[in-house]
């Protein structure tokens, strides 16, 4: 029991060596593909360049164009909102989804762009999905970050911000992180140091 808990604790608080090596190798892609756009957006919203670069590495590994990821559980929740079986999902209400087809909901339940924003986040930004996955994806992603947790980010709450980006909630005061990958937050924090040195 204690050995297992120790492993889980270590894995969620420290970057393991093989992940660290992979992140260092992949950082060149992030710089080559996104550095200029991130510098512009970071300045426009007064957000830390190094955090945004580390987040891009976590979310899309610096690949441009970034991939997409469909989330079936989000799709089911959005269907329930549209069909009147659920009052809301985050800031999405039935009025936002009136007459939306299943294909439209599928796009809203897919993450897009360098920050892998869920399609339904476009509603808050008042943009189209093609905007967050297109040439201005960095700008729209940073705008969403600014609206959602920008004040925390400007205060340097990096641990909370990485956790919020992935889960929608701050880092737990007690217990383990609830990110999809237990290495998500420690890898992000290590990335901040790496990109600060390269800025």
Identify what each model region corresponds to.
Residues 18-24:
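Active-site flanking loop/helix segments enriched in acidic
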Residues 70-76, 179-184:
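Juxtamembrane/interface motifs at transmembrane-helix termini
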Residues 65-70, 175-177:
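Short, solvent-exposed loop/turn and secondary-structure capping segments
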Residues 16-17, 55:
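A composition-driven signal for long, intrinsically disordered, charge-rich low-complexity tracts
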Residues 64-65, 72-88:
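Charged mid-protein connector segments
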Residues 1-16, 27-33, 37, 43-45, ...:
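Non-catalytic cell-wall polysaccharide-engagement segments
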Residues 25-33, 37-57, 62-65:
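Cell wall/extracellular polymer interaction/catalysis modules
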């Amino acid at each position: 029991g204690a050995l297992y808990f120790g492993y889980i604790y270590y894995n969620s608080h420290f970057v393991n060596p093989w992940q660290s090596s992979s992140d260092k190798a992949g950082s060149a892609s992030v710089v080559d593909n996104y550095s200029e756009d991130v510098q512009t957006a970071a300045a426009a919203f007064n957000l830390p360049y190094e955090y945004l670069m580390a987040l891009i590495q976590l979310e899309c590994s610096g690949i441009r164009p970034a991939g997409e990821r469909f989330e079936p559980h989000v799709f089911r929740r959005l269907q329930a909102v549209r069909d009147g079986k659920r009052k809301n999902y985050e800031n999405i209400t039935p009025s936002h989804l009136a007459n939306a087809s299943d294909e439209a909901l599928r796009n809203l339940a897919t993450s897009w762009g360098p920050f892998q924003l869920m399609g339904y986040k476009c509603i808050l930004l008042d943009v189209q999905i093609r905007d967050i996955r297109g040439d201005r994806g960095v700008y729209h992603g940073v705008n969403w970050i600014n609206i959602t947790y920008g004040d925390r980010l400007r205060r340097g709450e990096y641990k909370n911000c990485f956790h919020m980006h992935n889960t929608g909630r701050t880092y737990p005061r007690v217990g383990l992180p609830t990110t999809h990958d237990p290495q998500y937050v420690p890898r992000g924090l290590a990335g901040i140091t790496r990109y600060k040195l390269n800025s």
